[in-house]
């Protein structure tokens, strides 16, 4: 790199004791510094595994240990049938999942297949991160013939099939059966109006000494069902599907419930507003009901020794729909897109794989296999949630559009506004106005 | 490094005093030596450039764009000052987070320093076992920004928490502190104040440096304990107070972990714990508005720099350096 430096040319006769050794050492170090990233790059290339004729598909999801085991088994099955394909699986808890997915995407290195939900599907689809699966569907490489049409439709964003439903769920009102029986109280039923539900909850509070129902005014999925029953929707095109008046009515409904003692105090409501399953009031014993998704029943059951029941949210149950609990999406820039699509096709339609996966991600999307799985299952909580959902499926209404860009902010703003009203820091009308204004800003940007 | 006394030009990187005649030859050696220097520096240098400097500059660029993480860099649009404009004119939650952070820092930092100084004064004696006590008081700050600690805090200060059980002993009915928008931030302040160990240790070291003859002289002049504290301890300690104040203020503004854990990453209840950094995080990673979040980060950086400048420029009025002249 440098012309040889003659040692004697050093000033004041000073010489290096071992110039050659030094220089060699120096060069060695330099080489090491330069080479290190290369080694890393070489290792990274090795990941593609192109050399041994095998393809490695990366797949990323959120969930717990149980899901990880089931998914790994299903993927092993795929490898067994297609020995040339192996998987690089990554999974983690829901908290932080989307941060990581976004970061991976930003780094230009997202997984070939990733799990996503309706909170983010539109965000990713609108920015062309997801592969449009329509082409594969048309070519018959992705079999959706056994899917309920509304469930499939709930993965369509701007005319593109952005995600394939990995499971189906719907809103479920979970109540503590043991508590009700002990106090000689009636169980709530599907079809009760919101007013009836609140009156029932008031009665529970009085007799059982436990607040009858969690106040769901901060919960977008409850608000959504209620809106649909009023002939409105959460979104209409790229705009909001409701007005300040609607929100005011919604907040006032629950103010009445709080005033009559049907709900817990605001701080407890706030605890229950966390999305964490273990914090749902029905399992922490701080309320007789919680507003959740039907497929969360088995998970809730693990956190309480009480018996739980589940029904639809109050009002007309046809406001509920076959919601994709989560989707599988394929990265648009994936080098192995065709294979990746084949894998999600396998996860949705292979009888053995679907049996393995069970209802962990919601009811299987393939209706034929759903029947098989529900006949086979032995877990009582799972059986219960399947039965309820199958019954609700008879009355399901049409799917709404997938939530638009800015939805996560809208959810956060609803929680903020509702809690403002709950803590008595704003009237329902003030909170509603604040919410709508914040939403408009959120979806505009 | 600068203290090396031997003028050995071949071993010093900067050798501008060398005679011109030998420059060419030494130049090569210097080159090699300089290169060696960089090679040995490289682990740190690569870290600084790759992890700090370059990303910082990129974020400065991003702050003028509408970057949203998911869109490729090539499609990012330059929006000029729009992000900054939005922050100051049409983002109530930004202003809210500024207020939350300011009130947190203005209350928690002085109280933390007062607690640290108070305990340091108590522990600055030659009791037996005082070392153990110092260790115990220092312990909480070892746990620093730990998530576990924040979780413990949440459980201590909720409705059924240990703190309310303690209050119940005196017949006082507690509040759901962490779940009450009027008290959640205060709970975080108490957590921050409780971790006063680090400044305490520095205060202790400073107290040991105060010459005892000053106290003796003060005693001779008839000064009581309070006068001695005000007229001897405080002035002698002022450089240490200044150091702690600057450091803790910067720390206070950057509080994140506890607020994140306490509110499940939302800044709730009702945005009462929406610290600036938490708001920045939510904006960047949940709302995916990374360009706007970058602008927020730069405003934050400049604000902290300004505050530090204010500290340094007012320091000369009250910070006393004991080497005879005030700097």
List the predicted regions and their residue ranges.
Chain A
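C-terminal capping/gating helix-and-loop segments adjacent to ligand/active sites or protein-protein/ligand interfaces
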Residues: 386-438
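Extracytoplasmic/periplasmic substrate-binding proteins
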Residues: 222, 249-339
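Helix-loop-helix "hinge/cap" segment bordering the ligand-binding cleft or interdomain interface
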Residues: 80, 86, 137-138, 155-222, ...
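Hinge/lid segment of periplasmic solute-binding proteins
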Residues: 119-170, 309, 393
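Mature extracytoplasmic/periplasmic domains
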Residues: 298, 330-408, 444
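Extracytoplasmic "Venus flytrap"/periplasmic binding protein-like
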Residues: 76-146, 181-184, 280-284, 289, ...
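Short, well-ordered beta-strand elements
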Residues: 53-64, 85-90, 112-113, 162, ...
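Short, low-complexity disordered leader/linker segments with a strong preference
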Residues: 1-58, 80, 430, 437-445
